[in-house]
Amino acid sequence: MSVARITTVNFNTKEDCDTMVENYVANAVSEFPEAKQLLQVRTSDTSVVAISLYADNEAMERASAARDKRLGASHHQHESLDTKTGEVKLNHSSNN
């Protein structure tokens, strides 16, 4: 079964969040090539939840350097950051 990393970031300003969202949309696919699925959800003007699915823990760990680089570059813009990981129990996608 695959694993997920769920990261919630609260930014200091709407503009900081806007910049990060635009950058993630433009670059995440190339930065995290082993990710089976990448989702980003804007939950408020200053908050984002990113969900990354990987085949296994090893693949997720190999992505850690790119994740650390991305988050480190914008750390001064974060009000708070929370990360959780776990085994995916359901991954349903509908073509509707």
Predicted feature locations:
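Short S/T/G/P-rich N-terminal loop/turn motif that feeds into the first structured element of a domain
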Residues: M1-K69, H76-N96
